[in-house]
Curated annotation (Swiss-Prot):
Residues 116-133 have a biased composition (Acidic residues). Residues 1-50, 90-470, 868-929 are annotated as: Disordered. Might be involved in the organization and polarity of the actin cytoskeleton. Residues 12-22, 92-103 have a biased composition (Basic residues). GO terms for molecular function: actin binding; actin filament binding. It comes from the Eukaryota. Residues 253-262, 355-370, 871-890 have a biased composition (Polar residues). GO terms for biological process: actin nucleation. Belongs to the formin-like family. Class-I subfamily. This is Formin-like protein 7.
Amino acid sequence: MSFLFRKNGSSSRRKIKEKLRGRHSDRGGKREEDERYGGSGSDLPPPPSPWGFLFPEDFVRIDGNLKAVIVDDEGLDVIYWKKLLELENSGKIRKNPKPRRRGDKSGDGFRRTGADQDDNDDGDDEVGDESIEEAFSFHVKKSQSASSSGGEIRDQSNNGGGGGGGGGGGGRYYTSSSASPSRPSSSSASAASPSRTSYATSAGSDYGGGGGGKQSQSKFQAPGGGSFPSSPSQIHSGGGRSPPLPLPPGQFTAGNASFPSSTQPPPGQYMAGNASFPSSTPPPPGQYMAGNAPFSSSTPLPPGQYPAVNAQLSTSAPSVPLPPGQYTAVNAPFSTSTQPVSLPPGQYMPGNAALSASTPLTPGQFTTANAPPAPPGPANQTSPPPPPPPSAAAPPPPPPPKKGPAAPPPPPPPGKKGAGPPPPPPMSKKGPPKPPGNPKGPTKSGETSLAVGKTEDPTQPKLKPLHWDKMNPDASRSMVWHKIDGGSFNFDGDLMEALFGYVARKPSESNSVPQNQTVSNSVPHNQTYILDPRKSQNKAIVLKSLGMTKEEIIDLLTEGHDAESDTLEKLAGIAPTPEEQTEIIDFDGEPMTLAYADSLLFHILKAVPSAFNRFNVMLFKINYGSEVAQQKGSLLTLESACNELRARGLFMKLLEAILKAGNRMNAGTARGNAQAFNLTALRKLSDVKSVDAKTTLLHFVVEEVVRSEGKRAAMNKNMMSSDNGSGENADMSREEQEIEFIKMGLPIIGGLSSEFTNVKKAAGIDYDSFVATTLALGTRVKETKRLLDQSKGKEDGCLTKLRSFFESAEEELKVITEEQLRIMELVKKTTNYYQAGALKERNLFQLFVIIRDFLGMVDNACSEIARNQRKQQQQRPATTVAGASSSPAETPSVAAAPQRNAVRFPILPPNFMSESSRYSSSSDSDSES
């Protein structure tokens, strides 16, 4: 096995030597087999070299043959492999006449390696060691045709001084040689090949920058009847020190591409990188396989599919036919025992594709690196004829291609009559296209999804969801859900959609836009705002909620039709400011470009400049009747309440009892001997409790007034009885009489609240609202007058109705105002009558509130007294029965007395004994006066 490296200085030579020595041992003339190619080691590829060089284990040795690879300075471009044994046996290869530096020399002029060479040679400055020596260089005659079978090779050896080292001058190449065991090969002869002999396959002087010495040439015939590249430009595509020579027409070979020697892809197919295919599985036509996909050796791929990148397949596959329209891509290590190949015109092979050195490629096919696959072509695609040779005036050589995963295609060669098909365009960086879908039918899940999609009707309205926990009935037991499936109930779907569906409202026919209406009549997309956009949107929401057109609104303003209060309130609420109204009226642009609210306001104000003033007056007209009626009712209630409080009655008796009780309790203090008290103290009577905490001052006062009124009622009753000659109460005891007085007085005091009905109503009137209502009515009447004054000479139906309303409202409001002044004076007098200084308070209706609360407290006290009285009546029969058993001589009449006391009196009417009470109260007041 032989490798050729460009001379690259002592440092690079030392690195090359260390790499070759570490990976390839030649001690004893025996080469250790690489585990990658036949050993038992790992199948992983060797780590990339930091200098970009390729090493022996990256290539397979063919029995009886030597592979020679030329690598440039950066290790990018691989030229080709060659069977050198046939050339050596035929005498067409001349051995190196000038062995490099020191070392054993054989009789044939070649440097010996392995056991014949010292293994511990560590000279860094010497290139010639056990694994590196100078090689020959071959060159094809420029006159030799690429398709001729008798191509010759000439040897070019730079014998001159000039450039040496660093890859810049000299142009010499070196090869590493090693002995390897022979393997059977179908393409090699039985004769053994001297493995120490090295051969070169490219001209070093063509790459150098400064070698100017004499060159010796010898012609050689290319093996297999093929031809070698005609210039270094064909075998070197990157990193050269000088511009490469022009390529032959239609050819392009990228660096680092070594082709398998026996894999002949059929026309129309290709294979992606790092993929070695099985020995008996040809891909069907129209398919391709990418690298790194582990394929079986006999599994055919269905149409439209391909394996993924870097498939690790069998490495001993025979020729794998590829259909037409496909090609073999990057870094694909194929089988190593195939027939020689030559590259016809119109084809090129970009870099990094490990292909066979003698695999014929039909026209129309090419090999690319890191490029997406081309679309498959027909199975029996015929190759186009090769292009004619270039004319005498050849174009200048193209610039060297940039370093990258793939080199661009060369420019089309000039032809005289006709040119071949142009090279394909550069592949995109997005990678190969996705494989076509499986031609088989849909899967089960796909069928399910399709079935579900068929049941969904896009026009069916969507209903509101019902959030529940879905359950599956248990088939192992009987459940209620098993009986529901076969039920006969069916709901009304239309009704359910109407109630729970999200159905878009269709516009009415009157508001719908005709189909033949032009786009210019509709609202433009770019709207113009006179008002603030946010304010305009808010007004538009209100206007749309009314459901009225601008014509209906204008008709309402001009004719004065009756409208609902809510509608007029919304229209009056969106009134713009005077400045905004001026801007809207002065707008001289296209009204159709205005926003919805701005456009509607523009048309309304243009038709009726005082539109929103009319809305306010019309709203006042509608609400005037209810507001005036409420105000009149409040005035009547206040007047009646004042009259109730000024009448002398039971309320005076209660105040008298409270005053006397307070003076008795405050005797000897500054608060005692009072002549009057503030009525706010009435609310505090229930807070003063007795010593035993069983009663309050309020209960005591009310009970005393009840007893007093009951006694008065009993006296009046006795007077009437004495006139009739009956004396029913003469035989009653004092205790029984007290109970009788309380029973007769409770209905009298309990009916006090009914005598102050208007007082309790007046307490519910808010003083601020009462005053503000009258002021608001007067203000709106003035606004109506102002509107009518501004509209003089502009009479319409609406203004006529407003004038009639104004005349009646103005007169009525004057009467209400005067009545209100009179009643408020009455309220002030009543307040001063009960408590002096109360006029300083802000709320003049506070007196009514205090008395209402006190009357409620009195009613509660009466209820408590009646409850206690019933308890005493229930305990009295038991005591009487015990007394009767101890004194049996008691008369039946006395024993029957407890039964008489157990009788419950009926509830008396509210005004019972009112006349007698009034008479007695009047007599008392007269005596006091």
